């Protein structure tokens, strides 16, 4: 089975459908994304925009999900393509990782101490704090 993501005019994933392998293959049985795209367009309209995604292969960084963005020309190592699916950017200061298809904070998340871990503490990103002072951003939260 093959999976294809439909993109809107902003390259945001609106749905993902499953397509039979035979609907992505030529007469010789060779699978091709373009054949799968044509099949999807025959089902849901010639003007629709489709990109193949995969659970099993690292072909585009992440398996596409509704709301994710398809980005082209992203220089990420360890990803089989420079065209990747990424979640929505969580904060304005975060950038795409150069090693994986995911967003990274501009500051490394601090490591929790053993005591903090035992207390169930965790760090959250505070964009306002970072914008006010770009040497801060991670806030330690401890449940009561």
Predicted segments, located by residue:
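Interaction-interface detector
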Residues: 1-144
């Amino acid at each position: 089975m093959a999976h294809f993501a439909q993109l809107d005019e902003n390259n945001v994933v609106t749905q993902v459908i499953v397509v039979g392998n035979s609907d992505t293959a030529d007469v010789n049985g060779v699978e091709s994304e373009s054949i799968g795209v044509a099949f999807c367009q025959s089902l849901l309209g010639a003007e629709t925009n489709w990109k193949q995604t995969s659970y099993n292969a690292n072909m585009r960084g992440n398996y596409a999900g509704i709301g994710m963005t398809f980005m082209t020309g992203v220089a990420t190592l360890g990803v089989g393509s420079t065209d990747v699916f990424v979640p929505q950017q969580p904060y304005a200061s975060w950038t795409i990782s150069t090693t994986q298809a995911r967003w990274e904070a501009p500051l490394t998340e601090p490591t929790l101490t053993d005591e903090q871990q035992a207390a169930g503490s965790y760090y959250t990103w505070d964009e306002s704090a970072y914008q006010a002072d770009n040497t801060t951003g991670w806030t330690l939260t401890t449940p009561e």
